[in-house]
Amino acid sequence: MPTRDKLPPCPDPERYTLTRTREGEYWRLKKRLKKPAVLNNRLQGNTELGKKSSSAGSRIYSALHPFLADLEPRRIFHKMITLLRNGFRHDGRLDVSVLRELDLQKDYPLRKLIRSGFQWQHDKENHVFRFRIQIPERNGALLRQDRQMSSYRFIIILVHGNPEQEATMQTSSVKSGEYPFAGTGTIDECQLELSYTPEPGQWLFCLRAECLAAGKVAAHPRSRALLILDGGRWD
């Protein structure tokens, strides 16, 4: 730092001011002329990104709440926000497809509950989602974890709308009949269809499986699961 004896002439009186310290004096650029710190801009950008992701995640979570209320999602909401934020970073806009194959109950995922393979289809031409699963002759398509569990069923769920706007998310669902764990003596198949009217916005297609005891959903969270099968955008 230059001392008083070696202090050079002021580069530009309009832009610089003399600063005195114990070590000496020097010309400093006036504060109003300094460029904003790149780090501050980055932090502000991350803050805005976090707000957008959190708001979108809250709206999606609220739309799914009727099917989430009896689960133990733990920190799945934070996982959802993280995935949405990464989607924003990738191309600068919200993309719910990053939630594809997200199990909404980490400790009791669908793969641990379901015993039969299933298929699903998005028929874009006819605007319908289809789901099918084979029902075994004996036992069940779901894992019976308690003797009090007598039957089980499936629910397909469609959430659609604009997660970036208030009060635009809609939810529709189709529920199967009940299938006894004891079996019916014949091989059966559960087939569900959910029709929709495509509107600009985004969608999530989900599957919930649940075990029943005395006609009600069994008490323990391990008796049910919810999985986001796919997601996308209708332009």
Predicted stretch roles:
Residues 1-113:
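Long, polar/Ser/Thr-enriched low-complexity segments
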Residues 83-231:
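Charged linear interaction tracts used for macromolecular binding and regulation
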Residues 6-10, 45-46, 52, 59, ...:
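C-terminal tail/extension regions appended to the core domain(s) of diverse proteins
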